[in-house]
Amino acid sequence: MMAFAPPKNTDGPKMQTKMSTWTPLNHQLLNDRVFEERRALLGKWFDKWTDSQRRRILTGLLERCSLSQQKFCCRKLQEKIPAEALDFTTKLPRVLSLYIFSFLDPRSLCRCAQVCWHWKNLAELDQLWMLKCLRFNWYINFSPTPFEQGIWKKHYIQMVKELHITKPKTPPKDGFVIADVQLVTSNSPEEKQSPLSAFRSSSSLRKKNNSGEKALPPWRSSDKHPTDIIRFNYLDNRDPMETVQQGRRKRNQMTPDFSRQSHDKKNKLQDRTRLRKAQSMMSRRNPFPLCP
């Protein structure tokens, strides 16, 4: 008989582990039974411990676990606890992520490219910038290789730089010369102004108006708290039923009670008729009032 073979008689006095700390390793059934008993006992102790004691026990158990066991605990925690801040580009398919980015304007896409390397790769794809270039009929005159990325974004930026969008400038005072100008003298009260005097008066008025305005700096730094990135969020909308109920309450408060007003008018008319009747009766009873 082998030394590590399971015993035939499991109910003998040698296999009793009720009042003993010895665990029969060579017998799997008894070992599982003892493990379940001790696990239940540990659960009862854990229920009676305070929060700080439970944290100390969990910290000690995690420190004793191996790397694979710690990874197992991490996966279990991720299943139980929902993620608070989750990157949708890592969970959604690539096609859906590009579809979401396609609704952004060029400035927002450039801001998204500064989040991380993964977002930079998505925000600079040609599938997004090609549509924005074709919208203004901006084409490229070469066929890019598969290894070249961000060609359409660079082309968009270059075309925007080449646009000459400036405000209309008034000609300088010295350059604005009217040839053969003759002053018209007339004794009439409504004298006509010459074009040169009219231009001088308009320029003086413009200078007076612009003197109060501050000149813009040559370069304005980026806003620390930008507001152009704030979009209309559907989750911020109010409940439609609640808005309808509030509108009805306001209407009821604003509209007067016509039934009550009509009742008050009837009461006033009745009081007036009674007063007139009483005055007429008094005048009949005393037709000749005594003079003082």
Curated annotation (Swiss-Prot):
Keyword Protein biosynthesis: no
SMART domains: FBOX (SM00256)
Domain F-box: 86-132
Region Disordered, residue ranges: 188-224, 238-292
Pfam family membership, one: F-box-like
Annotated tissue distribution: Expressed in heart, spleen and colon.
Subunit structure: Part of a SCF (SKP1-cullin-F-box) protein ligase complex.
Function, in words: Probably recognizes and binds to some phosphorylated proteins and promotes their ubiquitination and degradation.
Record's protein name: F-box only protein 16
Species whose genome carries this gene: Homo sapiens
